[in-house]
Structure formats: C-alpha cells, structure tokens
Amino acid sequence: MSLVAIGINHKTATVDLREKVAFSPDKIHDAMRSLACTTSSNEAVIVSTCNRTELYCNNARAEEVIHWLESYHNLSHDELMPCVYHHEGQEAVRHLMRVASGLDSLVLGEPQILGQVKQSFAKAKEAGTVAVTLDRLFQSTFSVAKKVRTETEIGTAAVSVAFAAVSMAKHIFSSLASTKVLLIGAGETIELVARHLKENGVSSMVVANRTVERAQAMCEEFGATAITLSQIPDFLPKADIVISSTASPLPILGKGMVEKALKQRRHQPMLLVDIAVPRDIEAEVGELDDAFLYTVDDLQSIIEQNMASRKEAAEQAEVIAQEQSFLFMDWIRSLESVDSIREYRTASMAIKDELVERALNKLAQGADGEQVILELANKLTNRLIHAPTQALTTASRQGDLNTLGQLRTALGLDKH
C-alpha cells in the first residue's frame, strides 16, 4: 500500500458521468471521512471540480478506493471503470503536482485549479482526514505550483478570448483602474471578461444587454451598472473601453454612433474589442482615427501564438513537477527509514528489558553474579543476532550476492 490517486476528468469522462461522480460542497466533509474510515487509508483528500473528481489517499489500495467511489455514488463497475485513471507512489505525487500547476487542465496553465486544490485540502483538514504525509504532499504541491508560475511563463499568455481581450486592454492603457468600460452582452464570455477586468482593478463598468434583468444579475457580482441596448448612445461617450459579445444577427454599434461619441469625447481614443460572431461592431468603425477596433480574428492569432508559448513553458513545468516528485519520494523514504529505525530500536530495547528483568530476579534470589552477567550477555547476543543471521543464511542459500553484500555492509562486516 502507498500513496494513491484515483480520478476521472474532462479527458476520460463525459459531462454526465462527471456530474454523477462530483461531490457537493455540503457533503464533501462527510465523504472524506467515509473514504478514510471505510478503506484502509488513514488520510484522504477529495478534489471535485466541474472538470475533474480525484481522490488522494495514503496507505490505501487502488481497488478499494475505486470500490468506495462506486458504492458512494451508486455506480456500476462497468460504468465507472473505463473512465477511471489511477496512479500510485511517485506517479501519484507527480500527477497532483501537474494538476495544481495547470498542466492537466482543459485550458493549459489556467490558474483557477490551484485555488480549487487549496480549497479541497482545507476542507480535508477541517474533516480531520489529513495527517503528516498528505499535509506534506499538498504543501509541497503548492510550492511546486508557485515555482511553475514564477520560473516559467505558463500563466502569462492569454489563451481564452475573454482573457485575450482584457490583456489587449492592459497593453494599450497604462492602468485599467482608472478606465471606464462598457460591456455589451451578458453571456458567459462577457461575464468572464468582467471577472478579469475586476481582477485588474476596474471599478467603473456598465453592462448593456437586450434584457436588463440578465445584466442586473451579473452587475450585482461585479458592482457594475446595468442598462438596455437602447441606452448605449448615452453611455458610449464615457467609455474608454468597449467589449462586445452578443448573439445579435445585426451590428449593434455602427460607424455613425461611434463617430458621434468620439466627438463628444473630444477625440480621446477609444478601444473597441468585438468578440462576437457575427460582428457586433461595424468594420467601418476601424476607419475612424481615434477608434481602435479589434475583432475575434485578431484575438485568435494572439491566442494561437500564446498557446505555442504556453506549450513551451509547459515542458519546463513538467521538468519541475518531475524533479519535485522525486524529492518528495526521497522524503517518504526517509520517513520510512525513521519508522524502521524506531521499530528496530523498540524491539531491541524490549529484548534487553526482558532479559535484564530476568537477570535481576535471579540476582535477587541469590544466584552467582558473574554467572548471571555471562548468561545475560550470551542470551542478549543470541537474541539480537537471530534475525540478521537468518537474513544472511537466506541470502547465501539463494545466491543473492547483492543482498548478501548489503547485509554485510549494514552489519559492519566489511570495515577491514
């Protein structure tokens, strides 16, 4: 038994199965306690996100962890098993380090997974299912993820349209904190854009949408103002940045509307990013002197370049994860050696205590002191050399010269 990682993810399982295997936040504490108690594992951490569910256990067998997962979610072996992957020992360590570093994510290098792994670890500590080994493993993993972020460029290049749009704005404006932003649309992409903008210090955001109720729901999260599409002409002159992504079949911003807004701005530059297909902003807007229009095609070329950059950085990150997983296993082995030494010393002390007690009893009964000491020395010697003698005999009979040599070295027989 050793460290075990069991899981399914976006590469091995459908959304339907991932939903069945996921653990809800309100039940995950009990699930981790059940996993630790039901299996031979004495430590357990469950990482459950929309793209993956993974179980990390110490001192467990892969088969029993898989069986527990099937039983917990009432899934058949045939349904789950084709989608499950499992790693043990050093490979389990390396896998966790790769996951936390974003090397196993749907979007290579995405940073959100590290936060999710940290949350899972915190919940496991709350549940009382983390001890020395998994605590050290996850702390080491967080250090590896930080090392990957600081020593490679895996997280610096935008690889989503939303992130690329905000990255472009950051390149054009020295600081986004003082800019006013108009977002057109209230779908998933615009919501992601708003999140990236908020993370970059933008405090003045207006969200325009066909249904203002949808925009208001999003605005509550980001402290933005919701308006209808018909109100855009009133708010456009105040916007330094316009990012649009709707499902409209016709353009929402025309050249005339933008030209009028620029005049009201006294020709202060305006960045417009159109990430809709079909376009939300007329192509002719790009002809205006103070309007800087970028489309989804412009962003896509940036994303492709950045993906190549991330893949190169990922190769460096893989080396870091591999090296650090080896170092962790060195620590595991040192821990095992400490345990072995402690057990060996305890066993030897028990033999000594037993024989000394017998010797003292004999002395108390008037036995000859010299004879008692000699008997104690002989018995102690015989008891202590019994196991090494058996090991030497077995290695010699089997012709195992390697083990024989190691035993001779360990017993100090080859000093001269």
UniProtKB/Swiss-Prot annotation:
Pfam families cross-referenced by the UniProt entry: GlutR_dimer (PF00745), GlutR_N (PF05201), Shikimate_DH (PF01488)
EC number: 1.2.1.70
Enzyme class: oxidoreductase
One record GO biological process: protoporphyrinogen IX biosynthetic process from glutamate
UniProt keywords, alphabetically: NADP, Oxidoreductase, Porphyrin biosynthesis
Binding site for substrate: T49, C50, N51, R52, S105, E110, P111, Q112, Q116
Pathway, per record: Porphyrin-containing compound metabolism; protoporphyrin-IX biosynthesis; 5-aminolevulinate from L-glutamyl-tRNA(Glu): step 1/2
SUPFAM superfamilies the UniProt entry points to: Glutamyl tRNA-reductase catalytic, N-terminal domain, Glutamyl tRNA-reductase dimerization domain, NAD(P)-binding Rossmann-fold domains
Binding site for NADP(+): G185, A186, G187, E188, T189, I190
Catalytic activity from the UniProt record: (S)-4-amino-5-oxopentanoate + tRNA(Glu) + NADP(+) = L-glutamyl-tRNA(Glu) + NADPH + H(+)
CDD domains membership: NAD_bind_Glutamyl_tRNA_reduct
Molecular function terms, GO-annotated: glutamyl-tRNA reductase activity; NADP binding
Active-site residues, record numbering mapped to chain: C50
Keyword Cell inner membrane attached: no
Keyword Repeat found: no
Domain writeup: Possesses an unusual extended V-shaped dimeric structure with each monomer consisting of three distinct domains arranged along a curved 'spinal' alpha-helix. The N-terminal catalytic domain specifically recognizes the glutamate moiety of the substrate. The second domain is the NADPH-binding domain, and the third C-terminal domain is responsible for dimerization.
Other remarks in the entry: During catalysis, the active site Cys acts as a nucleophile attacking the alpha-carbonyl group of tRNA-bound glutamate with the formation of a thioester intermediate between enzyme and glutamate, and the concomitant release of tRNA(Glu). The thioester intermediate is finally reduced by direct hydride transfer from NADPH, to form the product GSA.
Subunit structure: Homodimer.
Function (record text): Catalyzes the NADPH-dependent reduction of glutamyl-tRNA(Glu) to glutamate 1-semialdehyde (GSA).
Family statement: Belongs to the glutamyl-tRNA reductase family.
Protein name as it appears in the record: Glutamyl-tRNA reductase
Organism of origin: Shewanella amazonensis (strain ATCC BAA-1098 / SB2B)
Gene this chain is encoded by: hemA
